[in-house]
Amino acid sequence: MKILVVLTYYYPHWTGLTAYARRLSEGLARRGHQVTVLTAQYWKTLPAEEVHNGVRIVRLPTIMRLSRGVIMPGFPAAANRLIREHDVVQVHVPIFESPLVTALAKRYGKKVVITHHGDLVMPSRPFDQFVQFFVTGLMRRALSQSARITIHTRDYAECSPFLSQFSDKLVQILPPVEIPLPQPERVKAWRQELGLDGVNVVGFAGRFVEEKGFDYLLKAVPLVLEQLPNTRFVYAGEVNVVYEPFFERWRHLQERWKEQVLMLGLLNDQQQVANFYALCDVLALPSRTDCFPMVQVESMLCGTPTVATDIPGLRVPVKLTGMGRLVKPMDEQALAEGLVDVLRNRSQYLRPREDIARLFDLETTIDGYERLFQSLV
């Protein structure tokens, strides 16, 4: 098959969404399919076209950033050409151009599969709320014209008023999770380097944005320390998020607890990410809203249980595996109690890597998409 994949950001950009798209695209390419990715040239130093791990990447110049997206003047012409050349189209939303893609595909008799990565939930500022309203409208139009909509979990979809409008099109395919085995000797050395020998380590990872709820974790720090003074919190991720300066609102808490809260920055190397998970005794996911953060399953595969808020989508890995605790969302007291429980009773929450890998198998995910695409060609 010739498969066209459309999304705003692709390799070497790294978020959960781009990791999803890259793992799936490269997996399909390994099986002999011709996969082309149409995406933004968000850095001018990136080549306009290249082949990476068997996937052809076509990058379009951008003229400006708009909230979380970018404006690509050359998109209509490029999409028009590439859609005609391919058998089926996959669009990862949100992306401004999604209704244009579905309209062009309809013109040429090509089917579109839209992969939904969560309802768009923006901060309460007026401009952000306008973007949320506008982009959700674009998504609604695109989803109405699509052949199928892939979702991460039924749990999230059943609680989403937006997705309930398209229940007859929904197909659940668990996300493609892939993480190398941790390196015990390097993990041990890293712990020593960071001064973490003999202490409890609470990890948290991802973009420091409002939806991730890391402000509640910072509020929970003194509550955890009251019961377990020998605890440190270690963050891996990006705090300088261009479209949402949320960290600045809570920097004072990080600085207040700077001896207990270590900031590692963004980790781009997947082996280093695996070692980070193994460095931690528990991973905290205090999200306000989250469709399905793959970091949770990656952490479990590296032997680290999680404490996550009991919200649609996010709660699924803990419910399926038992490898962690669910706590009330937006409640630092509940979060602290969950973290203390897992730290004190960690052995009760451990599960064999093989059990986690059977539930979240990369090849099974690729199988699901391969069958879906073939059914539409």
Q: Which positions does each model-derived feature cover?
A:
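Donor nucleotide-sugar binding/catalytic pocket of nucleotide-sugar-dependent glycosyltransferases
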Residues: 36, 132, 136-184, 196-197
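Short alpha-helical donor nucleotide-sugar binding micro-motif in glycosyltransferases
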Residues: 83, 143, 275-280
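Conserved acidic donor-binding segment of nucleotide-sugar-dependent glycosyltransferases
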Residues: 320-321, 325-332, 341-346
